């Protein structure tokens, strides 16, 4: 016959105070380590009380030409200085001619070389065999593009916490080639100064990316980067978790060159009519802005989850000490008998009043 009392027995917790310094010290060490990890490391150092979100943002850029061009570039044909690559004619375009496309809200393009083709279609474009023919072709460098300056106006917004700031209201930095955060407040280059917009010379921007336009192209070593163009990622990372004051927000620029890429973009200018056009093939420095970061705000549920996670560790530590006591120590049998106790079954017992007037439970009446 099945003993359902044994099968469906209920296990309850029994507190046994084992006077053994080995177990006590081990359990105390576990407790201190777990509390230190949960409270000091997870909750305080790692800021487990914060709800973290990634901000979104917008970018506006402007290109400014220098007040005075250098006029002594070794890559220009009219310069006698040696240059390790083919020299081209140079043109001194202002910012309106050097920038294309205009109004790009996610990137920025500064031309370094332009192929200019004067094309005409001496036929009707309604004819499927009609093609444009090139009558004049020129290939030129945009001289002294490194002296142009870029204004970067950026704004960040964290939807959940509704934190919003313009870059001009924040402190900021830019990472140099060694990964150091530096702040610029020079006559031309300004980065991270509150109340001032961020402005960088293209030469400085390339320097932070470790790029020289006269280095070999990333896809054809017989040409310089100036000839083929390049693509740079400009990361703007916002954070208010670098200190314990959540009202302090900073941003950091990091500029990375995209390997094995060149950049060019076509531009068509219609002249007298659609049959007459100038075709520009621009090779350029392409900047792609990526706004990211970590914005934190106090959240009680996050704090509660951080603290509750420690309860599981406490349970594991108690289990380890218990198993050590009942399975490995020399006194394991004694400790096991103290920890585990099985009651007798009350299934078929009857209540009897004895001669002293006390209630007694017996399995059968013959036990009297």
From Swiss-Prot:
GO terms for biological process: calcium ion transmembrane transport; cellular hypotonic response; regulation of calcium-mediated signaling. Disruption phenotype: Null cells are still capable of osmoregulation and do not show any noticeable differences in their sensitivity to hypotonic conditions. Quintuple p2xA/p2xB/p2xC/p2xD/p2xE null cells displayed slight delay in their osmoregulatory response, but are still capable of regulating their cell volume in water. Extracellular purinergic response to ATP persists in the quintuple null cells and p2xC single null strains with no alteration in the kinetics of the response, but the magnitude of the response is lower. GO terms for molecular function: ATP-gated ion channel activity; intracellularly ATP-gated calcium channel activity. Residues 282-295 are annotated as: Pore-forming motif. The keyword Transmembrane helix applies. The chain crosses the membrane at residues 25-45. Belongs to the P2X receptor family. This is P2X receptor C. The gene is p2xC.
